[in-house]
Amino acid sequence: TVPIRVELARSIRELSKGYMGRDNIPEGTGMLFILKKDEKLSFWMKDTPTPLSIAFISSSGEIRETRDMTPFSHESVESSEPVRYALEVPQGWFKKNNIGAGSTIELP
């Protein structure tokens, strides 16, 4: 088990803002995006100066895939299938903690 402290993003404003404009995201923290239903998700890094990694997570808490994202990129990073959650963390956190597709998270 690897603990992580997360901010929750649920409202439309929180979901669309994410980590935009934040210069520092402490190690061991992340942002969990919570959707009302399973859907294909798309994220970009506009106005986000910190390199991030993202996990796309099923409604049962299984990580389906992880991807790295480039600061300030306008390119979309999309889930390959409908998911319920996404977790953004400092880039490399998943790899460092040996977490990837098939891993499960305990959801709030």
Identify the role of each PLM range:
Residues 1-108:
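Compact, glycine-rich, soluble single-domain proteins
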